[in-house]
Curated annotation (Swiss-Prot):
The gene is Orm8. Glycans are attached at N25, N34, N76, N94, N104. It is found in: Secreted. It comes from Mus caroli (Ryukyu mouse). This is Alpha-1-acid glycoprotein 8. Expressed by the liver and secreted in plasma.
Length: 207
């Protein structure tokens, strides 16, 4: 499921802050600093998620893979999101902007007159982060995982599994991404190579 779509469809309530997150090795409610924003400005891979609501689970199953780029703007506190999704045999591109609230550590998306929120959970040690949604609603709650590399370590997998159980869900509800099904990575690589060749041609013509 696309990151911006998740932010539109789900809204967060801070029930998790009332729990003890140490059991899942996660920290809730940390302020978002410029250092964090610099760390987030990178390429990210959607690794998996656990969502209670059926249509959200189905949306994840329809999307084979997703990677995206985050570019932060410190002047107006927004984040540009550029994503590439593999859906079937197609590579689908999309771009949008996210807001963020520094004090309570949340991302936000304003759509159709409604602003929804997701709590950012940084897993810096693992080069990853999670987003938590609707944790007070047993039928809608969800947790998603993103990492800087598509090859997930066993330790990161276990951290996410523990976090999912900690918010009252079951490991069986997790859908992990199979990056062997990615169609967008090769396309991006070809576009980058083509761009390099295009830059070389004018130089060769002047030689």
């Amino acid at each position: 499921m696309a990151l911006h779509t998740v932010l539109i469809m789900l809204s967060l309530l801070p029930m998790l802050e009332a729990q003890n997150p140490e059991h899942a090795n996660i920290t809730i409610g940390e302020p978002i600093t410029n250092e964090t924003l610099g760390w987030l400005s990178d390429k990210w891979f959607f690794m998996g998620a656990a969502f209670r609501k059926l249509e959200y689970r189905q949306a994840i199953q329809m999307m084979q893979t997703e990677f995206f780029y985050l570019t932060t703007n410190l002047i107006n506190d927004t984040i540009e999101l550029r994503e590439s999704q593999t859906i079937g045999d197609q590579c689908v591109y999309n771009s949008t902007h996210l807001g963020f609230q520094r004090e309570n550590g949340t991302f936000s998306k304003y759509e159709g007159g409604v602003e929804t929120f997701a709590h950012l959970i940084v897993l810096r040690k693992h080069g990853a982060f999670m987003l938590a949604f609707d944790l007070n609603d047993e039928k809608k709650r969800g947790l998603s995982l993103y990492a800087k590399r598509p090859d997930m370590t066993l330790e990161l997998r276990e951290v996410f599994q523990k976090a999912v159980k900690h918010v009252g869900m079951d490991e069986s509800e997790i859908i992990f991404v199979d990056w062997k099904k990615d169609k967008c990575g090769q396309q991006e690589k070809k576009q980058l190579e083509l761009g390099k060749e295009t830059k070389k041609d004018p130089e060769e013509g002047q030689a």
